[in-house]
């Protein structure tokens, strides 16, 4: 009985498939639900018929309702983090910081005006023994004029009479000199402290003049003749102290309130850049300077501007009897004018 039913159902299905292929009609599906107990569904589904379509639709609807009831809700999708767009949001531009206002600079307090230096009044001479006056040491030359003065420093040869001595010390104390008794060189053959030559220089009518002065405690051709104190000097005239090799143009030694002049000096009266002079008295005439070929001695040179203030005041204020300071403020320029050799 079962076998016959199975054969009948199979034939009916085959007829239905052939009819579908012949008519090329709408695919119809066969409901295999009643045959599941006897056979298994074919691997390839046949096109459903109208009736099977309705049945499957009903079945599908029922299944969909069941699936909706048991369907697991889809997980909520976590949105990916949004990458910030650097162009979208711009950092706020900070407001410019105003430059600090500088504190007002106070006006400089003017330096107090120093009280005027009171006039010291006339110089009061401070005499000390002629052999107690300490000379100034020769400073290192710095200026052009100082260097030229050292370079052309003369040498003096003592024929007779006193040797040169310092005239003033740093404190302004001055030599008391010597009386005119005894031999011309008695008591004045040289200081134990050393000797000194004084210098001062300037331009005169386009020529550079350097005056060198010596002090002697007395000028005495013989005992009782002459006078206390003596000053003698020589002026060396050069073309320009500021060139490499200045030229000696003339030499004017002092002689009895006047000058002897050599323009230019004799070759044998110059030793390199040092002119040579002699100190001599031809009896009964007092001492004077003159050019010579004989070599002499050098002394430490101190220029006018290198003297202490008190020493300059003393040189300007002290009276030396019949002698006078040739390089002080009152005598320097007049003597240069008088000695002009050209």
Swiss-Prot record:
InterPro entries: NPP1. GO terms for cellular component: extracellular region. Its main location: secreted. Residues 93-121 have a biased composition (Pro residues). Pfam families: NPP1. Residues 1-19 form the signal peptide. Residues 55-75 have a biased composition (Low complexity). The keyword Signal applies. Keywords: Glycoprotein, Secreted, Signal, Virulence. PANTHER family: DOMAIN PROTEIN, PUTATIVE (AFU_ORTHOLOGUE AFUA_5G00600)-RELATED. Key residues/motif important for the effector activities are degenerated in most NLPs, including the nlp24 peptide consisting of the conserved region I (11-aa immunogenic part) and conserved region II (the heptapeptide GHRHDWE motif) that is important for phytotoxic activity. This is NLP effector protein Pc107869. It comes from Phytophthora capsici.
């Amino acid at each position: 009985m079962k076998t016959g039913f199975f054969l009948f159902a199979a034939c009916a299905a085959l007829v239905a498939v052939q009819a579908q292929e012949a008519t090329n009609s709408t695919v119809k599906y066969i409901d295999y639900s009643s045959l599941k107990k006897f056979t298994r569904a074919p691997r390839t589904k046949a096109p459903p018929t109208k009736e099977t379509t309705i049945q499957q639709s009903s079945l599908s609807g029922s299944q969909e309702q069941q699936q909706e009831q048991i369907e697991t809700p889809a997980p909520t999708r976590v949105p990916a983090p949004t990458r910030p767009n650097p162009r979208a949001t711009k950092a706020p531009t900070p407001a410019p910081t105003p430059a600090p206002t500088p504190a007002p600079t106070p006006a400089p307090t003017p330096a107090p005006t120093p009280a005027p230096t009171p006039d010291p009044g006339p110089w009061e001479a401070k005499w000390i023994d002629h052999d107690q006056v300490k000379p100034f040491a020769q400073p290192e030359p710095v200026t052009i004029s100082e260097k030229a003065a050292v370079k052309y420093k003369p040498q003096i040869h003592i024929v007779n009479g006193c040797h040169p001595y310092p005239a003033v010390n740093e404190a302004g104390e001055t030599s008391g000199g010597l009386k005119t008794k005894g031999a011309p060189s008695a008591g004045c053959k040289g200081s134990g402290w050393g000797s000194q030559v004084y210098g001062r220089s300037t331009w005169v009518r386009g020529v550079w003049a350097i005056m060198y002065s010596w002090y002697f405690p007395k000028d005495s051709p013989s005992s009782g003749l002459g006078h206390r104190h003596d000053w003698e000097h020589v002026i060396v005239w050069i073309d320009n102290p500021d060139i490499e090799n200045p030229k000696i143009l003339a030499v004017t030694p002092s002689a009895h309130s006047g000058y002897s002049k050599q323009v230019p000096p004799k070759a044998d009266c110059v030793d390199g850049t040092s002119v040579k002079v002699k100190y001599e008295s031809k009896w009964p005439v007092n001492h004077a300077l003159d050019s010579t070929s004989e070599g002499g001695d050098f002394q430490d040179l101190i220029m006018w501007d290198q003297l202490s203030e008190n020493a300059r005041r003393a040189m300007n204020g002290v009276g030396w009897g019949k002698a006078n300071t040739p390089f002080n403020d009152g005598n320097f320029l007049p003597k240069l004018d008088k000695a002009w050799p050209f």
